[in-house]
Amino acid sequence: MTLADQFFELFKGLDRAHGAFKVTDTSKVKHGGRAQTMKEPYTVRLWEDHLEGKQGLGVVPINDNNGCFFGAIDIDEYNLDHAKLVKKLNEIDVKLFPCRSKSGGMHVYLFTREEVPAAAMRAKLQMIAVELGFGGSEIFPKQSQ
């Protein structure tokens, strides 16, 4: 199984649309570019392009059942101390996965083995964001139904 196949399996979300981001300016901390919603399923090929840095891919976490298998906290802080935040994440009793975002902040992912209601995912991530000191951060999924 390729890395793209693994990401395809891990990020299970809305299967009829996805986000795409084409970077056009890398001269600043936050890369400039064009984002758009594509009204078509995401594919392993799109994951390959994403992992190769050709085009950003955004999977909508909430599915048509108002459930999800993953969610994220979007911490948009330009002078973020990544090492300090990772240390905090390791102290929490929930397995979270941090990833640097294109803005220089961090996306903190929570994955589940089974589908959970989007409202429950949002509530859990909001609680974690507050515990981390980032209660005002954007939470995905954005909606609970």
Please tell me what each predicted stretch does.
Residues P98-H107:
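Short, conserved phosphate-binding/catalytic loop or strand-edge motifs used
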Residues R16-A20, V94-P98, G135-E138:
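Short secondary-structure junctions
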Residues A17, M106-T112:
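Broad hydrophobic/π-residue packing in well-ordered secondary structure
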Residues M1-F70, N79-K84:
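DNA replication initiation on ssDNA origins
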Residues Q55-V86, E91-D93, T112-Q145:
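DNA replication initiation modules
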